[in-house]
Amino acid sequence: MTKQEKIQIVEYLSAEFKNASALIVCDYKGLRVNQLEELRCTSRSANIKVQVIKNTLANIAIKNAQCPNLELKDTNIFLWADDQIALSKVVCKFADSYNEHFSLKVGLFDKQVVDIKHIVSVSKLPSKEELIGMLLSVWTAPARYFVTGLDNLRKQKEEN
């Protein structure tokens, strides 16, 4: 890889990391190619970006994105997205499926370093769509009860 290619990769990653709401670093040592492709396909469908990056390039990109230093070692795969919950769910589900060869190392949520426990706890939260559904259910409940009451009143009057 030429120096110019490395510069382009670092610039691209710096912009991506700066715009991402969440970044998770995982160890993938021992994963087979088809398992890695499964992670990529699942991630792609959830608008999550996945890339294996050299640690030196990743450190430079993270520094350029004004994020805290992560002190990266060994083999790392980087996953990042705008939705922290969706990213956490995908990564934790995959880690549960392939726990012998895939493990979470560290994360950055809103440019703050988070540990594995935090990532797992975020993965247990309802998704954005589920939260919107819950909110709509709460908002429509009074109208639904009012209509049900009117319908019961109508049925009662028809019986009498």
Curated annotation (Swiss-Prot):
Coiled-coil stretches noted in the UniProt entry, renumbered to this chain: none
Name the Pfam families on file.
Answer: Ribosomal_L10 (PF00466)
Xref: SUPFAM superfamilies: Ribosomal protein L10-like (SSF160369)
Q: What is this protein called?
A: Large ribosomal subunit protein uL10
**What Gene Ontology cellular-component terms does the record carry?**
ribonucleoprotein complex; ribosome
Q: Which InterPro entries match?
A: Ribosomal_uL10, Ribosomal_uL10-like_sf, Ribosomal_uL10_bac, Ribosomal_uL10_bac_type
Q: State what this protein does.
A: Forms part of the ribosomal stalk, playing a central role in the interaction of the ribosome with GTP-bound translation factors.
Q: Which cysteines are joined by disulfide bonds?
A: none
What HAMAP family does its record include?
Ribosomal_uL10
